[in-house]
């Protein structure tokens, strides 16, 4: 795929390194940063089966998680319970923001981490990645790894909007270490 797409690997890696580190590679970097850099480069090749894995990190697999799932329908993001039994809030089904960050901004940030495909597939995969809190929560300031982990587990706000788009509601939720999974929907017994 590298040669089919005409990608200059060295240039692609250098560009992604500059996205993370404006002064070039540091002497030491967290493994997650290396995984993110390599994942973005690899996704440019367009191989949907390619992935970067580390014993410390795998994209979309790190705790903590949202205590709900997200889905895309007609260009809107809907929130539903982690067991998929109902919407998170049936009167306010659509997500406006996560932790004060617009949901569309959260989605757009993760598109480069997904291999080339149809716009619908890319969006669906990006929305799915948002179940991992670290995919949308930003940590400002210094601190070590333990400090970042502690901050990742803080409660967060989910702003929802009604079907007609006229009313909003904000829920304060706590991240969970239990990964919600996307299964068959609707459940087979409801067909």
Question: Model-found features: residue ranges?
Answer:
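Flexible, low-complexity junctional segments that flank or bridge functional domains
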Residues: 1-191
């Amino acid at each position: 795929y590298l040669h089919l797409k005409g990608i200059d690997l060295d240039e692609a890696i250098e560009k992604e390194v500059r996205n993370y580190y404006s002064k070039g590679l540091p002497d030491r970097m967290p493994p997650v940063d290396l995984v993110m850099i390599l994942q973005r480069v690899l996704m440019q090749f367009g191989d949907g089966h390619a992935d970067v894995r580390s014993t410390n990190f795998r994209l979309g697999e790190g705790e903590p998680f949202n205590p709900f799932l997200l889905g895309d329908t007609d260009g809107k993001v809907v929130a539903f319970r982690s067991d998929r039994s109902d919407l998170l809030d049936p009167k306010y089904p659509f997500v406006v923001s996560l932790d004060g960050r617009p949901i569309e901004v959260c989605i757009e940030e993760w598109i480069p981490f997904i291999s080339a495909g149809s716009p619908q597939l890319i969006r669906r995969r990006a929305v799915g990645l948002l179940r991992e809190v670290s995919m949308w929560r930003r940590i400002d300031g210094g601190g070590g790894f333990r400090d970042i982990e502690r901050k990742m587990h803080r409660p967060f706000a989910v702003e929802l909007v009604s079907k007609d788009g006229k009313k909003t509601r904000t829920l304060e939720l706590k991240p969970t270490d239990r990964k919600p999974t996307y299964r068959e929907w609707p459940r087979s017994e409801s067909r």
